[in-house]
Amino acid sequence: LPGNGFDTYEEQDRVLMGLSGSVRSGVAVRILQQQGFAVAAAVVRLADTPEEHAAADAAKALAKKLDVECIALNAEALAGQDVETARFAALLTAADKLGIQYVASGHYARMETDTQGVSRLFPPESGAPDESDRLAALSPEVLARLILPLGDFAPEDVAEMAEDFKL
């Protein structure tokens, strides 16, 4: 089941990482790889603006540095929705087309599965800024497929890992 931190998964499991181009998202990719995932990346563009194009270029450059495949998703049609809801809708659609079970992001939040098998969102335990509120609008179906690899790490730990990973 999806989780946090350095849990381990079967080698054949695949995950589609929402890549922003930030060092933090690069660290999340490396953590997923260390957990045994085959990682592909996607950058979601919600508008046709210079800022969105620059962010997409940064994400593609990071993916190249990480040696992961990166696809660009044009999700302008979803731009009227909540930003995170739109981004994850685009990620899940792409994951389904690619036959990938999980999606991931570099948000500071944690996922846990309760005794009934329901995936629930929680704040990070690490003292990192709580970004679970940004994901609160996601449906249970999305949460069941979501992995948040940074949920157990403080920003200082992520910065140290970025140095170790030469990001």
Residues covered by each model-derived region:
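Ligand-binding/active-site lining segments
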Residues: 167
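ATP-dependent adenylation/nucleotidyltransferase module used to activate substrates
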Residues: 1-138, 147, 155-158, 163-164
